[in-house]
Amino acid sequence: QDVDQLRAIMRKVLSPTSMKGGRWDLTAPDLVEEAWSVLCEFAGNNDPLKDIKADQNRKALELAPYVRKAVMQSNNSFLEAVKFAITGNQLDVMLDTKTGLKKERASEAAMLDASINNANELEKRIKKAHKIIYFTDNSGEVIFDRILMEQIRTISSAELILVARTLPILNDVTASEAQSLGLGYVAKIMENGIQEPLAGTTLSKTSKEIQDLVRE
């Protein structure tokens, strides 16, 4: 029965002309929105990955003490926090719904180097900034974002604003979820204002308030 339902979902997801190469003016977020609407229809709600997101956050929270300890013991706590924030992206449920970020995999953060070449420049700019806007992404990963923001707090007195989703889409964290995870203790939480389940962040579709903040 589950296999039959999955086939039915996939048939409907792949049925639009846009999924068959009939339209080339659409972006990946546009296609995701079409597929997401099908999943929501079959699930009977607008957040079919809610339980999975909660599980990803739980797994990340279990790792948080280990990560904080590694960050605090590092010779460069800011750089270490950046590494873990990048590694946390491996919690993306769209890649793997069964496993989370294991402690062993978290330790791989220490091996990141080439992708962190600009961390020193980033740190300098953060120290000079008066306002920092931090766009969140996936559930689970957001816990490591919080640890990075905690480090930002230690090196900068800038106003720190965290932007999360207004509406659920895939496994991205919503503003209400970010609040429940305690991110409001380290940053002001704002909704992105996008009134459709659009993956990614299209600035032109965010609220005027967010657009004005980015352009300041």
For the regions a protein language model found, what residue spans apply to each?
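Short, basic, glycine/proline-bearing loop/turn elements
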Residues: 106-108, 133-135, 191-198
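Redox- and metal-dependent alpha/beta enzyme cores, enriched for Fe-S-associated oxidoreductases
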Residues: 144-202
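A short, acidic, amphipathic alpha-helical segment used as a generic capping/interface helix at domain edges
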Residues: 201-216
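A general structural motif
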Residues: 129-131, 157
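Short, glycine-rich nucleotide/cofactor-binding loops
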Residues: 131-143
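Short, well-ordered alpha-helix to beta-strand connector turns
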Residues: 129, 186-187, 214-216
